[in-house]
């Protein structure tokens, strides 16, 4: 899949494309409807399937304090887009100047002159151009004989609008199961493993892979979760009994560790029944279900007792996840309860 940063990077010999436009944060099931329609049309007419996304998020340009937390990084968006069959992603730097482009110029410059589009797919709530004056209907009017426009209805399921906002709300409530339902996949974060306080293995007997994220990143509410940890592809050797690209069962703590008075929020993953030196390795942490809320305990002994129960519940939830997703045995490691 090709990735272009800015319109100037798009090859001049791109002669036909089917295009979908949006921020696509999370690449949730609603986004997938747009992407699938774009890929289907591209294959039908022998065109390239192109996704246009914006970075930074448009809201952050005009209302920085109200900018939504990011569900996916650009790199994660790219990987998800490719998995659905997108041939190329154009990343546009969203600026105030760009937002002042008239809808007509927007179509002429982006869709016709740059991407040579024959077809464009947008959601029913799509807006574009100066003061967001362009809508899905006006896009149809502007394009008319120039290219075809497919407007996709927003996705409602079980009375819930599937949107990035909905996903963020589920995460803020700690309801990762519902977030996963809206996403059509496990919510996950990726990043390097860094050194934490060191008490997990030495003091508690539960060594963890620690990750820290910027406060612009969407994370589940503070609590303990069942999930999977996967070491991302690497040429560096992994010391221990874990290997890259295998999902290992993990009990995941999100929060500040109130029992020990920590202040920095982190994601700490205790991998069940495996042990490896993961420092410096990039890992993917997938959240499957909520285990319990974050608590402050009166003693380390009380904490250890509850953590043992967390591990037991994690095994049960992940065994159910394996069955629900019919996971191939070679893709994961989950040891049965002894």
From Swiss-Prot:
The name under which this protein is listed is: Bifunctional riboflavin kinase/FMN adenylyltransferase
Task: Give the transmembrane region(s).
Answer: none
Q: What does the record give under GO molecular function?
A: ATP binding; FMN adenylyltransferase activity; riboflavin kinase activity
Q: Which CDD domains match?
A: FAD_synthetase_N
Listed A to Z, the keywords are:
ATP-binding, FAD, Flavoprotein, FMN, Kinase, Multifunctional enzyme, Nucleotide-binding, Nucleotidyltransferase, Transferase
Q: In which pathway does it act?
A: Cofactor biosynthesis; FAD biosynthesis; FAD from FMN: step 1/1; Cofactor biosynthesis; FMN biosynthesis; FMN from riboflavin (ATP route): step 1/1
Q: Which reaction does it catalyse?
A: riboflavin + ATP = FMN + ADP + H(+); FMN + ATP + H(+) = FAD + diphosphate
Read off the SUPFAM superfamilies from this record. Answer: Nucleotidylyl transferase, Riboflavin kinase-like
Native species: Corynebacterium ammoniagenes
Its EC top class is transferase
The gene designation is ribF
